[in-house]
Amino acid sequence: MNVYNKADSFSLESDSIKDVIHDYICWLSMTDEMRPSIGNVFKAMETFKIDAVRYYDGNIYDLAKDINAMSFDSFIRSLQNISSKKDKLTVYGTMGLLSIVVDINKGCDISNIKFAAGIIILMEYIFDNTDMSHLKVALYRRIQRRYPIDDDEEDR
């Protein structure tokens, strides 16, 4: 971790969106007191939470509380739950939802670290290469525009 948390720029050619997401999820899993300050890359990642709220019809925090990756059964139920709502949430909203899930469950003990690892694995199942490309371009554009979330339709 700590490669991207203070980064202010992101390159479409040389940076990995998966690495950014992994670092970001690890950062989110820390308590607020333990989190190091962040740069533009993570500030732009935070905007995906806004997408989750915007695109989900119900209370996104209720849905987030139902997501759990601590056991195999709960992992599968969470995967099915997110997959069934992915068309409503969009790729951006799904990224935001999973960010909210980790933020809700943050902490210092080992179970929070396992939880964050479970969410990272869950993302590997949910996001395909096309989704990752969309996230990469959206992140790049949000950094360039200093985080506005009004991405073009072609980004989705």
Curated annotation (Swiss-Prot):
InterPro entries: Poxvirus_Bcl-2-like, Poxvirus_sf. The keyword Coiled coil does not apply. Gene3D superfamilies: dsDNA poxvirus (1.10.437.20). Keywords: Early protein. Induction: Expressed in the early phase of the viral replicative cycle. Belongs to the orthopoxvirus OPG029 family. Interacts with host TANK, TBKBP1 and AZI2; these interactions prevent interferon production. Interacts with host STAT2. Prevents establishment of cellular antiviral state by blocking virus-induced phosphorylation and activation of interferon regulatory factors 3/IRF3 and 7/IRF7, transcription factors critical for the induction of interferons alpha and beta. This blockage is produced through the inhibition of host TBK1, by binding host TBK1 adapter proteins TBKBP1 and AZI2, thereby producing a strong inhibition of the phosphorylation and activation of IRF3 and IRF7. Also acts as an inhibitor of the cellular response to type I IFN by interacting with host STAT2. This is IFN signaling evasion protein OPG029. The gene is OPG029.
